[in-house]
């Protein structure tokens, strides 16, 4: 059994070059969407069926005088499927198309998925998209085919700043811990690891070093990192109570009486 | 305030129609069963009509659900695990969509059998036979079918809640809302379809039932909005055109609620039935579409 693998994405050294996006599309033969040009450098906007890597630009730096020591910078982060230990997509998938591979990654089997799209509403990171071309849900495979050929994922291979690092989880954890310590030593107090421990979906095989709170990057914090199944009991209970009251009300209203034109059918 | 970053699954018209048909099919079956078990001898005709209409609606459910899939011909993957080397049946009790698939299949069987028997008895009734009372086992069969029908009408809402989508996952009341509204629309539909079969007493009882169901729906609706408000998600369902839809949904509850309050039979049966049914459809449209933008 191979060792669990994953990505460590260090957003502190991401320069927003999008080489990861290009390499991912090239290798996985993704056509991509028509670029969306707006007031910023982000023209892919989101992760979806055609974008399995997406460089987020958090560029809403307020206008103002920047002096030494009070500067503000854009934040950039190459986002990707988190390959969660407790994966919400895998939890709800009715066809069992979403499986955990021998590399401990989360993989959608294209031939098994029938395109019900329940996984899309379950994924808390907005990672999965539906492809009208294939009729299936699609997302990062962590280059499952390349892993089988002992190659590293395409995005990690091309990343010029080593913002995206691939390797065994234990190695990546050690590198991330060292990097975080270095940043804290430099006074970057907001720097934090996201998904390194088990507080977010039991741990993420694709985890991040962030330079601000997770919410700033559009990532759920610990309180909001919840599984869909949390609502099972309450929802079923409410539905059951409503159904029981409905049946009771129906019986009360519809029961025949001698006044209503005859004896009850049950006693006829 | 709860924060969500899930993407929209693109569940639109087919799913809306499926959820709507599921509520009607389940509701009609339940009302037919109640009429059979607790109604008068004359109500048996209306019970048969309910069973006869429930089955085509279930067939529509299957069609809508299948057409919505990205790969409709692979619909059976919901039930059979086609993962290489795995095999066996797909059964995930913690995934409502998985349980719902089986519930739909089972309810289809129950509604088909009820449809066949009701159609046969209907033929006998037209031939003038006197004894048309169903055998005892039919009643037991119908009770089991009703439980499945109620599940079908409600699980569609639970599917939405068991997600990470805003609005849907912010409320646990959607399943309750769907089952209450399904019963309400079914009572309205039954009153309208069965107007030639029902006497004044039956019509009055159906309207009273619809009034109770509408009251239940109103309570579920209040719970839905309260839970959304608590999660800070009201704005995600009351934006754009959707607040107008929600107002129409509330207005559609007025005819059955008025009938509940009045002792006399409410006027405009066909129109009020249409208003109730349209309101139930609008409610599903508002729930499903407003959360996906």
Locations of the language-model features?
Chain B
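Long, contiguous internal "core" modules enriched in hydrophobic/ aromatic residues
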Residues: 12, 19-21, 38-41, 47, ...
């Amino acid at each position: 059994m191979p060792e669990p693998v994953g990505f460590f994405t260090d957003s502190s050294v991401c320069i927003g070059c999008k080489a990861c996006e290009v390499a991912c599309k090239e290798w996985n033969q993704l056509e991509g969407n028509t670029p969306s040009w707006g007031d910023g450098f982000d023209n892919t906007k989101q992760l979806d069926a055609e974008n399995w890597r997406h460089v987020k630009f958090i560029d809403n730096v307020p206008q103002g005088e920047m002096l030494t020591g009070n500067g503000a910078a854009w934040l950039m982060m190459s986002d990707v499927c988190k390959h969660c230990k407790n994966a919400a997509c895998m939890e709800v998938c009715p066809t069992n198309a979403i499986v955990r591979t021998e590399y401990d990654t989360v993989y959608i089997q294209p031939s098994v998925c029938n395109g019900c799209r329940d996984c899309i509403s379950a994924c808390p990171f907005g990672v999965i998209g539906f492809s009208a071309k294939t009729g299936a849900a699609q997302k990062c495979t962590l280059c499952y085919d390349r892993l089988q050929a002992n190659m590293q994922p395409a995005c990690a291979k091309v990343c010029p700043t080593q913002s995206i690092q691939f390797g065994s989880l234990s190695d990546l954890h050690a590198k991330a811990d060292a990097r975080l310590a270095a940043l804290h030593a430099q006074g970057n107090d907001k720097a934090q690891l996201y998904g390194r421990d088990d507080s977010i979906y039991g741990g993420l095989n694709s985890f991040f070093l962030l330079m601000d709170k997770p919410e700033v990057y559009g990532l759920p914090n610990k309180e909001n990192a919840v599984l869909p199944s949390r609502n099972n009991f309450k929802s079923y209970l409410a539905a059951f109570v409503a159904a029981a009251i409905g049946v009771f009300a129906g019986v009360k209203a519809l029961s025949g009486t001698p006044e209503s034109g005859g004896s009850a059918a049950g006693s006829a | 305030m709860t924060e969500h970053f899930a993407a929209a699954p693109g569940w639109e018209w087919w799913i809306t129609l499926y959820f709507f048909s599921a509520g009607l099919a389940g509701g009609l079956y339940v009302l037919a069963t109640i009429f059979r078990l607790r109604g008068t001898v004359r109500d048996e005709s209306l019970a048969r009509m309910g069973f006869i209409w429930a089955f085509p609606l279930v067939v529509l459910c299957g069609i809508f659900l299948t057409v919505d899939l990205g790969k409709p011909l692979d619909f059976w993957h919901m039930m059979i695990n086609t993962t290489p080397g795995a095999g066996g049946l797909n059964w995930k009790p913690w995934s409502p969509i998985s349980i719902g698939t089986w519930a739909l299949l089972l309810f289809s069987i129950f509604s088909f059998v009820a449809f066949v028997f009701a159609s046969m008895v209907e033929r006998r009734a037209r031939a003038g036979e006197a004894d048309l009372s169903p055998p005892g086992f039919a009643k037991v069969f119908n009770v089991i079918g009703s439980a499945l029908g109620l599940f079908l009408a409600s699980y569609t809402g639970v599917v939405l809640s068991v997600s990470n989508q805003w609005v849907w996952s912010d409320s646990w009341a959607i399943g309750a809302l769907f089952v209450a509204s399904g019963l309400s629309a079914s009572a309205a539909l039954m009153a309208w379809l069965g107007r030639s079969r029902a006497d004044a007493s039956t019509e009055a009882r159906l309207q009273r039932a619809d009034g109770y169901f509408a009251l239940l729906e109103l309570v579920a609706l209040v719970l839905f909005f309260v839970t959304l408000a608590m999660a800070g998600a009201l704005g995600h369902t009351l934006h754009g055109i959707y607040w107008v839809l929600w107002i129409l949904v509330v207005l559609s509850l007025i005819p059955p609620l008025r009938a509940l309050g009045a002792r006399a039979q409410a006027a405009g049966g066909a129109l009020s039935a249409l208003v109730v049914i349209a309101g139930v459809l609008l409610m599903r449209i508002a729930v499903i579409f407003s959360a996906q933008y």
